[in-house]
Regions:
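Active-site glycine-rich loop that binds ribose-phosphate moieties when present
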Residues: 135-143
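Non-cysteine beta-strand/loop elements that form the S-adenosyl-L-methionine
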Residues: 42-45, 108-118
């Protein structure tokens, strides 16, 4: 969710820092840029994606360091910019318990439950021309429905 007023971004609820394997921006730099841009509320929602099929991007953050950084910067920016402690947990088949444990492992303000893979296929790089589209759509929406029932 992004909130804007007078064409100025005031709130961003989905951001990733260097704690996510697909980003290299240190949390300190991202927060400084957000603050200098006039952001009032920012949720840091780095990836945790257990079972992700690409070994180059395991998406398993260093949780103690992540939690320490969130706590430090929330205090540092107190009264100037609200920093919400968040997590984007990928939910793959067979990984529900790991996702639940991560979500419950810290006092998060905001959790995004997402899935970047279906049937162990990476959605953003998958070649959809090689599959039956109707079967894939049915699998996709069945999985979305199943996710709504697990109550992370």
């Amino acid at each position: 969710m992004i909130i804007m007023s007078d064409d100025i971004l005031r709130c961003d609820m989905h951001t990733h820092t260097g704690f996510s394997d697909d980003r290299d921006v240190p949390m300190a730099d991202m927060l400084a840029a957000a603050y200098s841009s006039g952001i009032e509320t920012l949720a840091v929602t780095d990836h945790y994606d257990p079972g992700y099929p690409d070994p180059e991007f395991p998406f398993i953050p260093d949780f103690p360091a992540y939690h320490e950084a969130l706590t430090k910067y929330r205090s540092e920016y107190s009264g100037r910019m609200e920093i919400l402690a968040g997590l984007e947990t990928g939910i793959m088949e067979g990984q529900f318990e790991a996702a639940q444990n991560a979500a419950r492992g810290f006092d998060y303000d905001f959790i995004i439950g997402s899935f970047h893979c279906l049937r162990s296929l990476e959605l953003h790089t998958f070649d959809f021309s090689s599959t039956d589209k109707q079967d894939f759509i049915e699998d996709f929406y069945t999985y979305v429905y199943d996710l709504s029932l697990i109550h992370i």
